[in-house]
Amino acid sequence: MLKSYIAFDLETTGLDPMNNEIIEIGALKVRDGKVSERFMEFIKPQELISPAITGLTGISNDMVASARPARSVITDFIDFCEEDILIGHNIIFDYSFTKCTACLLYTSPSPRD
C-alpha cells in the first residue's frame, strides 16, 4: 500500500479539457498513511458557469467571482504536489484536465490566464 501520495479531485465547467475549465481543485497530501496537508481552491473561469454545472457541482459564479486565475492556482497546485504520485476517483479525467490546462497556460500566451 502506498504511504505517500496526493489524492485529488477537480470540478470543471464541462467534459472537454480543450474547451472547458477547471473551477476547483481539492487535494490531500498523505504521508505515512496520514493527511499532512490540504489544498482546496476555486479558480476564476473565463466563461460564466452554466446553471447545469452549478446544479452538478454546487459551484456558482458568485463562489468563483473573487477566485484567483488558473495560472496562479495551477502553479501552486504543481508546487503542492512536488513529485508525489497522484491518485483519484476519476483520475484519467482529472489528470487530462490538469495536464491540458498546464500545457495551455505554460506553452503559449493563453486567454485562460
Q: Predicted regions span which residues?
A:
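Conserved non-catalytic scaffold segment of RNase H-like nuclease domains
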Residues: 1-104
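Conserved small/polar residues in nucleotide/adenosyl-binding loops
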Residues: 106-113
